[in-house]
Amino acid sequence: MQASIESTGNLERRLTFTLPQERLETHVGGRLRELARTTRIKGFRPGKVPTKVIEQRFGQQVRAEAMEGLLRETFDSAVREHSLRLAGNPRIDQGESDFDFVATFEVVPDFGDIDVTNLSVVRHTAEVTDADIDQMIENLRLQRRTWNPVERGAQVGDLVALETWSQAGNERLPAEGVETGSSVLGSGVMFDQIEKGLEGLSKGEDKALSIDFPADWRVPQLAGKTVQVHVKAVEVSEPVLPEVNKEFIKSFGVKSGDAEQFRADIRTNLERELKGALMNRLRREVGEQLIAAYAHVEMPPRLVENEARSMLAQQVDQMRRSGRNPGEIPADAHQGFMDAAAKRVLVGLLVGEVARRNELRLESKRVSETLRLIASTYEEPEQVIEMYRNDPQLMSGLQSRVMEEQVIDWIAERAKHTEQSLSFQDAIRV
């Protein structure tokens, strides 16, 4: 195989290679002969379709598929031959001839000796208590609450249906009429000063509030201004919580309606949530230590930029999902994510290096356990498991996640670590 490598930057390489033409022709010929034996075409007996007809009908597609496969195989072989470790996907361009190609890519930086025993890691622990289960049951009651109109003044926990309009200098919002809505006092959905101002209002009462909106407030006409907000309580309702009886318990999937089984199911769910939260804390803890220890190592610029663009895209998608308008995105908006992206890339590459150097292998048992854990959150867990097993992309993502967790655990076990006990609520808090 003809292949040459050159450095075009600290971490960028250019690989020039040539595909073996005879192998391509051999593969194409073999595939066309196979199609001639198996393809049914009107006017010809099975297995008797002339090669010329097969070539005319399938030749272009077969050649393209063969070229793609051989291109990937030849590139991978050249990478192994030159002992290269890629960071990200290569860009492959056509060379001077149909069989010449030029691949440009970045490589994993040299981290030197990776000694995780010098890292200091805090490993958090927590457990689910009966009080946590009681609190979850109370939360479930709140989810199923109904509302009963009252004539008294509104208080925290009440649902207030309201009308509002605002005066910001010479501008009235809305220009005509009022805006209507509702809010549970104390939920934090509305601006805090407005929620406080609603407390004590009875049905039909109104009030003018002087509100100082922050400079980054989502409504541009109000941002950074002192605004007169006029509010009127259209109706005040107090919550009515359901009893924890058999009907209530059955509504959450416990067919027997048994209270002890209900609590056991809640414990299982909370323990699953806690396990994920503790791993996220450990991942963040180990990541911060790795960043502090290896911040001096240069990261592949293109990989960092791609990660920054991905982070921006995720934020825009989250804004749209939550009903917020991300507005017009400047072409360089991803620049604001570059520092965070560089740290994320550093941790990702380091985790990969630790796994490679220490010959850590993916534990299939752990993959199966994680898959069962994910599936258990759905009504039809077996269908979810089957979906993952039949989708290579989903399964690959799961395996990458499990491998990362294995490496994080491996690092934490060998680092200098102390344990810190947390309550369940503190442990799951981001």
From Swiss-Prot:
It comes from Xanthomonas campestris pv. campestris (strain 8004). GO terms for cellular component: cytoplasm. One of its GO terms (molecular function) is protein folding chaperone. Involved in protein export. Acts as a chaperone by maintaining the newly synthesized protein in an open conformation. Functions as a peptidyl-prolyl cis-trans isomerase. Its EC number is 5.2.1.8. Keywords: Cell cycle, Cell division, Chaperone, Cytoplasm, Isomerase, Rotamase. It comes from the Bacteria. It is found in: Cytoplasm. Disulfide bonds: none annotated. The gene is tig. InterPro entries: PPIase_dom_sf, Trig_fac, Trigger_fac_C, Trigger_fac_C_sf, Trigger_fac_ribosome-bd_bac, Trigger_fac_ribosome-bd_sf, Trigger_fact/SurA_dom_sf. Belongs to the FKBP-type PPIase family. Tig subfamily. The keyword Lipoprotein does not apply. The keyword Cell cycle applies. NCBIfam families: tig (TIGR00115). Residues 157-242 form the PPIase FKBP-type domain. This is Trigger factor.
